[in-house]
């Protein structure tokens, strides 16, 4: 959950309003958010997922233009690799179970029947199927998640921001499991005139650096 805005400053304003403790969710903390619109971007340590950019032939033109723009700002991103030896698909049951728990009332009340998309992998059926996830497999997935969090930290600890294509890799599911923030920015249109984007991954509680870039 996060802001959808037209400018970085708008994002900072909205994020600063919705972040932190609300007295209801005990998992939320009041972490610092020291956003400075005039910060020197050259002070940031920036990496990029070179292998994903090299393999993203669909959006290559727009990706290259985005990286060129970033370099014009005086930033020279360094190649980075994320963990790739863990079964992320197996850990997906964690996200499925958490999503189903969040929408438990919707499922129990049968109001999910009112949702239009009722295909096999649509959310209503995903939430229903989540009730059949074995507890043992869920616990084993949590153990793998701990390993993923440690490995992700070791791979990315030296960087304030990591640039990545929005699609084509496991970074979305990975950061969903580790809790690292992600900022998505439109960067043009493809041959079918569909909008394209590029993504920026940050450190835990590193939203200020993400928005500043």
Language-model features: locations:
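A short helix-breaking turn/cap at a secondary-structure junction
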Residues: 1-61
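Acidic helix-start/capping segments at beta-turn-to-alpha-helix junctions
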Residues: 82-95
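An extended, acidic, His-containing surface patch that forms the Zn2+-binding/catalytic region
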Residues: 150, 156-180
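Acyltransferase
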Residues: 55-83, 103-116, 138-159
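Generic secondary-structure signature for well-ordered alpha-helical cores
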Residues: 3, 9, 16-24, 51-54, ...
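Predominant activation on well-ordered alpha-helical scaffold segments within soluble catalytic domains
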Residues: 9-16, 64, 100, 104, ...
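Short glycine/serine-rich loop segments
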Residues: 1-18, 165, 176-199
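Short helix-loop capping/hinge segments that flank enzyme active sites or metal/cofactor-binding pockets
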Residues: 40-49, 94-149, 186, 190-197
């Amino acid at each position: 959950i996060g802001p959808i805005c037209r400018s970085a400053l708008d994002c900072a304003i909205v994020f600063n309003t919705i972040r932190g403790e609300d007295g209801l969710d005990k998992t939320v903390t009041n972490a610092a958010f020291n956003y400075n619109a005039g910060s020197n971007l050259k002070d940031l340590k920036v990496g990029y997922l070179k292998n994903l950019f090299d393999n993203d032939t669909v959006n290559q033109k727009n990706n290259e233009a985005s990286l060129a723009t970033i370099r014009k700002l005086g930033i020279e991103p360094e190649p980075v690799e994320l963990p790739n030896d863990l079964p992320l698909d197996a850990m997906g049951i964690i996200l499925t179970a958490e999503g189903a728990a969040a929408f438990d009332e919707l499922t129990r009340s049968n109001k999910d029947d009112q949702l239009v998309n009722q295909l096999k992998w649509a959310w209503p059926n995903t939430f229903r199927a989540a009730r059949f996830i074995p507890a043992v497999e869920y616990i084993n997935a949590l153990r793998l998640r701990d390993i993923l969090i440690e490995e992700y930290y070791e791979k990315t600890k030296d960087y304030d921001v990591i640039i990545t294509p929005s699609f084509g890799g496991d970074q979305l599911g990975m950061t969903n499991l580790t809790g690292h923030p992600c900022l998505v920015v439109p960067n043009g249109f493809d041959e079918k005139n569909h909008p394209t984007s590029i993504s920026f991954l940050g450190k835990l509680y590193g939203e200020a650096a993400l928005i500043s870039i």
